[in-house]
Swiss-Prot record:
Compartments, record wording: Cytoplasm, Cytosol; Recycling endosome membrane; Late endosome membrane; Golgi apparatus, trans-Golgi network membrane
PROSITE patterns, per database record: C2, MHD1, MHD2
Name of this protein: BAI1-associated protein 3
Name of a matching Pfam family: MUN
Family: Belongs to the unc-13 family.
Membrane-spanning intervals of the chain: none
Keyword Kinase carried by entry: no
GO cellular component: cytosol; GABA-ergic synapse; late endosome membrane; plasma membrane; presynapse; recycling endosome membrane; trans-Golgi network membrane
Ranges for domain MHD2: 851-959
Region (Disordered): 22-44, 193-214
Binding site for Ca(2+) 2: D1004, D1010, D1068, D1070
Amino acid sequence: MSTLLDIKSSVLRQVQVCPSFRRKTEQEPEVTNSQEPPTGAWKPGDGVEFFAHMRLILKKGDGRQGLPCPEVLLRSGSPAPAEPVDPNRGLRTLTQEEVEMLYEEALYTVLHRAGTMGPDQVDDEEVLLSYLQQVFGTSSEEHMEAIMRVKKAKAPTYALKVSVMRAKNLLAKDPNGFSDPYCMLGILPASSAPQEPSGQKEQRFGFRKGSKRSSPLPAKCIQVTEVKNSTLNPVWKEHFLFEIDDVNTDQLHLDIWDHDDDVSLAEACRKLNEVIGLKGMTRYFKQIVKSARANGTAGPTEDHTDDFLGCLNIPIREVPVAGADRWFKLEPRSSASRVQGDCHLVLKLITTQRDTVMSQRGRSGFLSYLLLLSRVLRFEHRVEEPNSSSWRGELSGPGTTVLCLHGAQSNLSPLQLAVLHWQVSSRHHQTRTLDYGYLLGLLEDVQAHWEEAASLPQEQEESLADSFSAFSEFGLRLLRQLRDYFPATNSTAVYRLELLLKCLEKLQLFQPAFEICPFETELSMDIAAALKRGNREWYDQLLNTKSPREQPGPQRLAGLVELADIIYEDLQLCYGVYASLFHGILKVDFFTLTFRQLERLVAEEAWVLTEELSPKMNLEVASGLFELYLTLADTQRFWSCIPGRESRSLALAGIHTPFLPAVKLWLQVLRDQAKWRLQGAVDVDTLEPVDAASKHSSSAATASLCLSHIQELWVRLAWPDPSQAQGLGTQLSQDMCEASLFYTELLRKKVDTQPGAAGEAVSEQLCVVLNNVELVRRASGQALRGLAWSEGASGLEGVLPRPLLSCIQALDEDLHREAHTVTAHLTSKMVADIRKYIQHISLSPDSIQNDEAVAPLLKYLDEKLALLNDALVKENLNRVLEALWELLLQAILQALSANRDVSADFYGRFHFTLEALVSFFHAEGQGLPLENLRDGSYKRLQEELRLHKCSTRECIEQFYLDKLKQRSLEQNRFGRLTVRCHYEAAEQRLAVEVLHAADLLPLDANGLSDPFVIVELGPPHLFPLVRSQRTQVKARTLHPVYDELFHFSVPAEACRRRGACVLFTVMDHDWLSTNDFAGEAALGLGGISGIARPHVGGGMRPGQPITLHLRRPRAQVRSALRMLEGRTSREAQEFVKKLKELEKCMEADL
């Protein structure tokens, strides 16, 4: 047995997996022109060039949706543009004498260096001297002569600056668990250093000695700090200065004591600062010691009044050149002493007298350091980074060492050093560009040290203020030309701008710190003024370049379009890049400032130009104005899309008004150009798929692209006036509908002139055309929905305007109709084959199996659907399936009508065929839905097959059942009949009372009728002995009242049979001819009072009337009649004869 019955159409199963179609709107396949269209006006009627120009307009607007992101705008990491430099803005040029004096100062610093070098410093004297020779550019002879002069000069006088800051974790000496510490400190000459005889206990020097010590105290100018009561972590922050005789041998000695007596050595030592000279100080100190001992209670051999807490011995030569700022661990006087804790000291070795010309002439160390740093910085920049603007001032080892030595010897504070490096570097930056990060770091150093020291000599503060003013003036000049020196698309330049703004921010922070303010006004106001001036200069230059005012209006228009585009792009950059920098750093609203200024300027130009060009309106002018308006509208919307900002107060508000005539003219041309474009696309279309992945041809892609471009253009247009937008949108939607229908008409004409290949059952060209129609239907629907315009305050958000919705629905219906027409044309080529296979099933002998009879049809359908699946998109495949399904049902119905008096196997075979086709077309859910398959003609065919299998009486019963079903479906068109019916069980009779009728059809010429009612029971074989009865005729009325009662002697069981009913037929009595049929109604007997069983509901009370709607027999009622017509039995023929007579009456009425 064949297995074709199990075929579920593998083709149909794949339908759900395949995409409907793939729109290729990136480019039009048939357009291969690689050249961009000219920027001038397009030629009238040249659709390709027009839409190419429109694509450029749309492409220009692609980047204008929403607010820009900085990461999108920053596109280049190339070096930043070079900033302007001016050699005259640096420090003044020194005279030759001043250079020689500075050279001598630097050599003197190196030759008389003292202290310990750091790990990054150079301790080689020859290297340092050679470095200075290179910095000053002297010859070897001049260099040696200068060295000899410096060596003959007196050595400098050294001094040690000591800051006793704090101590921690000291030993507790008092009963309360604390101590009352104070410090005694002084300089120990080399001759006073303690000697340690071999074999004796280790003994360190101390400012106190036991009773056995008789030598004078060796310390010079002993200083003492205040006593800090009850603490183990004292804080002093006291500063002292000690002269140094020999930096190589002298030591700093410091003792920490616990103060216990009212009169102690500490109090006496405070007066030692008044003693001048070591000899006098020693004698005085000895007297103080004796006095303290005499007043104490301890014995001569006991410890002294103040308890020892620790000491420090620091050789002067070990003090770093840059100074020391650290914690020192306290040491005991001897190995037997018990001490703990640390002491924080700040040490710096300086010179107090220098035998140099600059010192002799009163030039301060501040000035000499400034000049030396400037010299070194210029030399290092020239050597290290001759052509770079990213140099961060990294000095070489010798350069750092020389400056460190000079700064320390000149006793410059950290604040002074920070100020000097800023002054020199900021001035040098204006002559040769440095890295702004380096300058920002210098400002941060100044700020940090300023907060600590908070003061400078007035002269130095004024010098710092001058450097701030010079740098701010330089920065403002750069900000005026912001777009030139810091282009927003260059990430390197933007980063330099960010650092420059941070430098200016630091300058702002210094304003309240100066007694003499370096700025006449607030720096932020100066910055805003510089930005405004820069905006105006940039705009004027751009206007003179792109659209000079002396040119005629039409020539200026193209330039103004370009200018407006540049301004929009500039505003994007301002918002996406510059705005956050200026607002976040300086609190300057750069974007608002720039937008309002540029928007006002470009609006003024646009108003003037539109007034000039309005009388000269033509296609070229309209094109230019249309493009100009789009950019201006984008500019206005760009402002309004920023939260909290409205565009009503802008100069561009209302700018759409003068552009309306140009926009209308341009949209009119768009309609004509669209048709030309579609015509050209269809002319060159070969009605073949674009590629293997697509099922539509090139013209459909072009049509879809055109519709999409029109919709995108409308979105770009976004006309602000609701009433005007409705008119423009309505016209544009009608133009799009017209273009879509125009395209389908062109396709139909092309198919008519290019028929498919001879003998081809399924035309590939028709499949492509069908796919084209579907693609355009979807594209047009999507494009039209995108045309939704605002209806003002009365419009609902998200609801399409009514005119647009009507247009969309009408076009969709038209394109659906066109698709069904093409589908019918496509399936008509299969009609002959389908009829042949249906006839094969009809003529198959009863001896073969049903599936064998159906096999050829299923195989044919499977092959054709495989071809259709490859050629059609899913939507069109479904259309073809539906058409084929209807075609098959009609073919089977025709086969059934053509065969009479056939065997039951014949109808069984077609019943099998119908179910096999349902399974085939459903394809396990991948094909047509079952509810669609089992509807319409399927029901009619299934009923035909069922009736053909029924007996004559079953067909008659079905006839009456159909009448009963018809009652509830018919509307009140033919009037109403009210009756009352019940069964009298005692007499075994049925009582039927005809009460009255209403709203009957007027069947006579006078507009009335002469109605009477025929009452009969059916089906006849259930009531063979019962004759029909009739009421009296009621003349000239449409609302007769009968009130007549009829009895029918019938058993109750007969009334309960299937199809048992009372049939009321209303006739119009005609005296001269055949009576006319007015309507009929049927009432089932199974539910009337006396017949209905208790579980059915108890029936109806005898007195309850029933109103029946009159109707005429419908098609499903006549199907049973047609079935009976083919029967040859007497019962069937008599029944049909009776009904035929009734139908004649009905036809006469029509």
